[in-house]
Amino acid sequence: GDGVADINIYELVKFHKSHKKAITVTSSQPDGRFGALEISQDNQVLNFKEKPKGDGSWINAGFFVCEPKVFDYIGDGDDVVFEQEPLMNLASDGEIFTYKHHGFWMPMDTLRDKNKLNQLWIDKQAKWRIWDK
């Protein structure tokens, strides 16, 4: 799957250059997929939040700015998964910063995601369509 966002690429690259590391990963805090219950110790429902903003975690939004030395972390072969060993080793070596994106971001991993994004486009609510502004 892929993600769709209204990331300011110029600001992302500027951020990357200012930190002088091998890679900058864009992060986002996606909305939760389900309603959340706040429950007391005796199981009484105290509050209900419809699809709250995630759990506060920042996730990999899938947009990267890389320096050539990133290739030194990628092994040979077709079985390399970039988000696993290469990124973990870059993080261990202190070579990753994150650009925290506070704007629109949505994955397109499922048919449900695709349909929602298509509907946003049809309704002219596609926040990633920045070239018409």
Regions picked out by a protein language model, each given a short descriptive name:
Residues S40:
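Short, acidic, Ser/Thr-enriched surface-loop or helix-capping motifs
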Residues V4, Y10-K17, P30-D31, Q44-K133:
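Catalytic-core segments of class I nucleotidyltransferases/pyrophosphorylases
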Residues H19-Q29:
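A short, conserved acidic/glycine-rich loop-to-beta-strand motif
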